[in-house]
């Protein structure tokens, strides 16, 4: 008998409520919680991290207020350079934060594949779990990153790791509807036989979350279709309860394939049973979620009804009474055997049932009157026994209902307790998913309760039907004395010799009625026997159901114990957190008291400052008044002094004005004289410029003459040189002649020649001296002209300077005149 079931929540998926945090999200970073190295790691500044480590090597594994290291923050932000720097410095790779997450889990969680690969290559442990029981592989499954999952598995990640809900990565991929991850994990030989805490298989979860693609993948993997959960439901039951006809059709086709394979191994006798099973299974799909009551026997044992044979009615009646029908046993047309077989493991159950019914038909004891009387005595006792059995059964059903109610109420209480604490199932993908999970479990428990109520109603209907059958038995027993009285009448009528034709007809009618009544009695007895057999079978079935209920109860008790242990663990953890919070609260209260005292002190200071400020304000107002008075007095004195100064200044200005007017007249006279001088100097300058031009012309002519004289002088020097050479030759000749001729004659000739030559030389020298004198004269003239030119330039410069001074003096005169006019 099934006590629990899941409701018809159709395809509730975790995917809708998961799209929140992992867009990631990472950490909530507050600047006040971080140290310098943590800030540098968040920004990805590897140089700053290196400087922090150079200053203080202890900052390598330093924790912030959330127990996070720089490696955690770098992996969350995806800064590969910082991660490589920290890993090369041999930091702690498997250090955990406040949620017991390692840097590897954080890198996989934030989908930072490069950081995760670096950590795995440096020996990070991929099998560590956070406080929610999730490993890095669970987070890779959630983010649907096959490359990350493959790297985790290649570095030794456990493919069958369990979270706190006993979900393996494969089951978690099915819950999140990650079809690619399911295919990937199955290729990596993940176990398709894994079950969660409620003993639900992968196929059941795929059906529950309405994933036909995943169902098809699992069926291709030859998953066990007949596996049952804690409540005895299989995958097809989930499809029926959620009204998923497509998935149900897939599962039925897969079952047919399995049964076809088994048909080849089983004989021809089993083939008929299997076909009956499939016809009944398809035709009579259960309306509720109760699978254990699907094996509901609606069969009745065929009754023996003797067909009337040719002969006397008396013989017919005796034969019917003795139960010796000569014809073949005829089954009641309205009572046909119908059996619903649910579990394919119970193959051939239909045949065994048919054999049992045939044996029951053959073993009906209706042989003699003694046997009938013995049977009647047992039947008289039977209603009481039946009523006792019915009461026991109803008590058992009521007990099972109470157990179910208590378990469901206990589960609901536990869930409300957990909600009061703040968490239900603490798997964070994210909190909304857990809330959905809790709502799902509560709804499932409510539906289980409704299923138990439906089961109880069905059992009550069966009991009412049995009561009606017992009433029929009582009516049959009430008819037996009338039949016996009729038989006695017929015997007496036979014994009396004086009976007439009318009595004979009456007896004949009575015999016919007697035969009919006996036939009815035989039918009723057969029904009673069949009901007894049915009741025995049902008792056995109910005993089995009670055993199943006990087993489920034991399993539920274990589950409750596990939940209680988990609750105690969570309560202990929450107690520790509460103690920490209390300590922090006391610390904060102490700080608050200190702040209050400081606030009081500050208030007293503020009051004193306010009094001082009021005094200062009054003083300030008085000082302002005095300052105004002083300003007024100062302004008055200033006005007086200004008036005095103005009067003195005006007198001075007047005197200066008179003096300036005198100077102006003098300057005008000087200006006129300068004008005359300017005109005269201009005329003289013109004359001098003309003389300068003539001098320049003369100078150029003299220069030409000097050049010509130089050329002539050079020619004369050349001639003198030639003459001196000739003279030397002449002297040599004279000497030679003197030697040859007479010294005296030669001497006279030589003297005459010398005198002639001397005159020529003296003439040349005189000419040269005269030309030199002329050159000197010309140079003196040029010097004089240059001096005159310089003098003229100086006079021009003085004239221009005097001119500018005169312009300035004119402007000053104009200014003084304008100032006089204004005054």
Curated annotation (Swiss-Prot):
Keywords: ANK repeat, Coiled coil, Repeat. The keyword 4Fe-4S does not apply. Disulfide bonds: none annotated. InterPro entries: Ankyrin_repeat_domain (IPR050657), Ankyrin_rpt (IPR002110), Ankyrin_rpt-contain_sf (IPR036770), CC144C-like_CC_dom (IPR039497). SUPFAM superfamilies: Ankyrin repeat (SSF48403). Residues 431-480, 565-724, 776-805 form a coiled coil. ANK repeats lie at residues 66-95, 99-128, 132-161, 165-194, 198-227. PROSITE patterns: ANK_REP_REGION, ANK_REPEAT. Residues 372-384 have a biased composition (Basic and acidic residues). Residues 301-343, 355-402 are annotated as: Disordered. Pfam families: Ank, Ank_2, CCDC144C. GO terms for cellular component: plasma membrane. The keyword Coiled coil applies. PANTHER family: ANKYRIN REPEAT DOMAIN 36-RELATED (PTHR24147), ANKYRIN REPEAT DOMAIN-CONTAINING PROTEIN 20A1-RELATED (PTHR24147:SF1). This is Ankyrin repeat domain-containing protein 20A1. The gene is ANKRD20A1.
